[in-house]
Amino acid sequence: MIMKKLVFFVFTLFLAAEASAQFTMPDLFSGKAKVVFLGLDFTQAKYIGRIGFTDPAAIKNQHMVSWNNLIEAEPKKFSLEKPLKLKDGQYTAQVTDMIKYNKAANVEDNIIDDEYTITEDKVKKSVAKYSLTDKDGIGVVYVVESLNKTAETLYAWVTFIDLASKKVIYTEKIEGKAGGFGFRNYWAGGVYKINNEIASRYKGWSKTLK
């Protein structure tokens, strides 16, 4: 009886350890973790070049939602399945949480003409505040640093998160050249270019982030 209890106790500890295990970048590369594209976090963003951002209410209430929805609505252009070389069934996109989170973003007071950057620490602090529906696997979020009309470029921190703990397991600043017809598509073009840049960096990541 004592031996049975001991075995049960050890097995329970093993299950607890498995449940609390954090995913890492090697788990992504090996296909052991499912990946959820969470979308775009605009709460840290500034909008550089006042002439390019004349309707802050529309940016917050319309475009932030639209930019995120494009990730699910147009997977051929915005899916991360191919850039991250994911297997069938390993990838999904779920942007609802970011759409809700972005309601706290302040656009009007963050339209500027000066240069602006954020730190990795700011990225981590923002991620720590997320309320996430998915609790298993690795989440990918673009913590947007700036939409820079002067440079015609979108700057974002591509951030990989262990969904269970909300721990940032890797983040890197990447830029995407904006381009497209109309305000929404112009900046969505920057997201598309960031996706392409991820594809070009994947091989290097898989070798160095072990």
Mark where each language-model region is.
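Surface-exposed, polar helix/loop patches in the mature regions of secreted/periplasmic/lumenal proteins
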Residues: 89-135, 141
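A structural "domain/chain start" motif
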Residues: 21-108, 210
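Generic alpha-helix detector with strongest preference for long hydrophobic helices that associate
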Residues: 6-9, 104-111, 175, 179, ...
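Bacterial Sec-dependent N-terminal signal peptides
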Residues: 1-26
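Residues in well-ordered beta-strands of folded domains
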Residues: 9, 38, 141
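Active-site nucleophile-His-acid catalytic modules used for acyl/amide transfer and hydrolysis
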Residues: 144
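C-terminal/domain-edge helix-coil "capping" segments
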Residues: 23-50, 113-135, 147-159, 163-210
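Alpha-helix boundary/interfacial micro-motifs
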Residues: 17, 21, 58, 181-183
